[in-house]
Amino acid sequence: MSNQLFTTESGDKAAIGLSLTCALHCLMVPLLLALFPSGVLSSLGDERIHLGLLFLIIPISVFSLTFGCRVHRNLTLVAVGVTGICILIFSALLAHDMGGESLETAGTLLGSGIVALSHALNFKFSRSACIC
């Protein structure tokens, strides 16, 4: 059981880090582009960065939340994490076209926060439920 807890904790930490990276990217890139409008920094605003982060966040989150649920049996927590992931997917794929930059930014920040919160709680509940 302790090996499963280790992999769950590692996945939770990675997902929290990636979620925060996504949120920071969303907040900092417009500021950096306004302060330093050079061609080098313009690649930071590329939408492929959002998709790349999603391709990392989704499997890590599914893995970690699934294994955490096996330990703590809290399906609500998994549903919260999946909701955050769905908001991130919506923000990356549709929000900009539907509501502009502000909807995309708001959705990304909301989704990232929900994903990070679900993994922080998954980490906490897995530790308290595990009798290793």
List each language-model region with its residue ranges.
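Secretory/periplasmic and organellar redox-cofactor proteins
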Residues: 1-13, 39, 43-132
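Functional transmembrane helices that embed catalytic/metal-coordinating motifs
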Residues: 14-37, 127
